[in-house]
C-alpha cells in the first residue's frame, strides 16, 4: 500500500476582493491566500500546520476537504481528487472546525451521533464500539442527552471530535480544535487524539495557534506564512533553525550591579537574578566556569528559546522576505 496519503503539488488559491475606489467606482484586487504549496503527508503522521492569521491554513484544509477548488495545482487524498471525489472521500476523512460545529444545535448529543451513523452508514457494531470509546475517553456520558446549544464550548468541541471519528476515518483534519478551551479540556482532547493516532494509525493534520498542542502531539511541523511553507520538519529542527541565542539565568547570593561577561549581553535584571544572552553556536561551559569563578552563585541554568519565540522570529523573516519580493516585483 502506498504510504503517501496526502499529496499537494504547486497549489495556489486566489480570491477577488472588490474595494471602494471612490463614490461610484470599485476596484478589483486579487488576493493570494495560498501561493505555491508543495508537501506530502504519510499515513499515520500527526502533522502540525501552523502560521499567523491569514497565512492560508484554513484555506488549505478547505481545499483538502473539497470545500474549495484550488486555482492551480494538484491535490490528492488517498489517490482521489477532493472536489471530484468528495462524496467517496467523505467516508475516509473526519473534519473539525473549531469555530463551527457539525452537531445539530437543537438536538441532544446522542441524536446528532445517531444521524452521523445513518449518514455514514456505519454498521451497528462499529458504531456502538466507537461511541463507547469516545464517550469513555472524552467523558461525554453525562452530556449525551443534553441539547448541543446548552453545551459549553469545551463540551461541544469534545462532542465534535467524537462525531468526526465515529466512522473511523483514515485522516482527521483539525482546524483550531482547542480554541477557547480550558486547561482540563485541552489536556483531555490532546490525550484522546494521541491515543487515537497510536491505536488506529489515524493521520492527523492539525492547525492551531496553541503551540503546546504541537509540542505534545506532533512529530512533524509545517510553518506556513503568506501562503507558502517556510519550514517543514521536526520540532528539534525548528528549534535549531530559529535559534540564534540562548540564555544564562544567573541567581546570585546577593544583589549586584549588571554582570559584564565577554560574549554575553544583559537582557534582564530582577533583584539577585540576571539574564545573559549569548550566541547559540557558542559553548556555555566557559561562560559558566567564568561566572562560577567571579561570583557567589545560588543557582545557574541555560535556557533554550521557547518555541513561541522561534516561530515568531520565523514569521518576522517571512514578512521581510515578502516585502523584499514585493519591492523587486
Each predicted region: which residue ranges?
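Conserved ABC ATPase "signature" region
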Residues: 114, 118, 125-143
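A short, proline-enriched helix->beta-strand linker immediately N-terminal to the Walker B motif
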Residues: 166-170
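Conserved ABC transporter NBD signature motif
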Residues: 73-84, 89
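Catalytic Walker B motif of ABC-type/P-loop ATPase nucleotide-binding domains
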Residues: 172-176
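Helix-to-loop junction immediately C-terminal to a conserved catalytic motif
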Residues: 65
Amino acid at each position: 500500500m502506498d504510504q503517501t496519503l496526502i499529496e499537494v503539488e504547486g497549489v495556489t488559491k486566489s480570491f477577488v476582493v472588490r474595494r471602494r475606489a471612490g463614490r461610484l467606482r470599485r476596484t478589483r484586487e486579487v488576493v493570494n491566500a495560498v501561493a505555491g504549496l508543495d508537501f506530502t503527508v504519510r499515513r499515520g503522521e500527526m502533522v502540525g500546520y501552523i502560521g499567523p492569521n491569514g497565512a492560508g491554513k484554513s484555506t488549505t484544509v478547505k481545499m483538502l476537504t473539497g470545500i474549495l477548488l484550488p486555482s492551480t495545482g494538484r491535490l490528492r487524498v488517498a489517490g482521489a481528487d477532493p472536489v471530484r471525489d468528495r462524496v467517496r472521500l467523505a467516508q475516509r476523512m473526519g473534519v473539525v472546525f473549531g469555530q463551527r460545529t457539525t452537531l445539530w444545535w437543537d438536538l441532544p448529543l446522542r441524536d446528532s451521533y445517531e444521524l452521523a451513523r445513518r449518514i455514514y452508514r456505519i454498521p451497528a457494531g462499529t458504531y456502538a464500539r466507537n461511541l463507547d470509546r469516545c464517550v469513555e475517553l472524552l467523558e461525554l456520558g453525562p452530556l449525551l442527552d443534553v441539547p448541543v446549544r446548552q453545551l459549553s464550548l469545551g463540551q461541544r468541541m469534545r462532542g465534535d471530535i467524537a462525531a468526526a471519528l465515529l466512522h473511523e476515518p483514515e485522516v482527521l483534519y483539525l482546524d483550531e480544535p482547542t480554541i477557547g478551551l480550558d486547561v482540563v479540556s485541552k489536556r483531555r482532547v490532546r490525550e484522546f487524539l494521541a491515543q487515537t493516532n497510536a491505536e488506529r494509525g489515524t493521520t492527523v493534520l492539525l492547525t492551531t495557534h496553541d503551540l503546546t498542542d504541537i509540542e505534545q502531539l506532533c512529530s512533524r511541523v509545517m510553518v506556513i506564512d503568506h501562503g507558502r511553507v517556510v519550514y517543514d520538519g521536526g520540532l528539534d529542527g525548528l528549534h535549531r533553525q530559529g535559534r540564534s541565542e540562548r540564555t544564562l539565568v544567573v541567581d546570585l547570593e546577593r544583589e549586584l550591579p549588571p554582570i559584564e561577561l565577554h560574549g554575553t549581553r544583559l537582557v534582564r535584571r530582577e533583584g539577585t537574578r540576571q539574564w545573559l544572552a549569548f550566541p547559540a553556536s557558542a559553548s556555555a561551559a566557559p561562560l559558566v566556569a567564568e561566572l562560577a569563578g567571579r561570583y557567589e552563585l545560588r543557582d545557574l541554568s541555560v535556557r533554550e528559546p521557547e518555541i513561541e519565540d522561534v516561530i515568531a522570529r520565523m514569521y518576522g523573516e517571512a514578512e521581510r522576505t515578502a516585502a523584499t519580493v514585493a519591492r523587486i516585483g
